Curated annotation (Swiss-Prot):
Its main location: plastid. May play a role in photosystem I and II biogenesis. It is found in: Plastid, Chloroplast thylakoid membrane. This is Protein PsbN. It is a single-pass membrane protein.
Length: 43
C-alpha cells in the first residue's frame, strides 16, 4: 500500500478509538465516578 493510505487508515482508527473511549467514559461504567458541578452548587 502507499504511505498516504496507511497514514489515513491509522489516523481514522485513532479517531474512532478516541471517540469510542470518550463515549465509554461519558456514558459507560466510569461515568458513575464523574462529578456534576451543577448538582454541587444548587441554590
Amino acid at each position: 500500500m502507499e504511505t498516504a493510505a496507511l497514514v489515513t487508515i491509522f489516523l481514522s482508527c485513532l479517531l474512532v478509538s478516541f471517540t469510542g473511549y470518550a463515549l465509554y467514559t461519558a456514558f459507560g461504567e466510569p461515568s458513575k465516578e464523574l462529578r456534576d458541578p451543577f448538582e454541587e452548587h444548587e441554590d
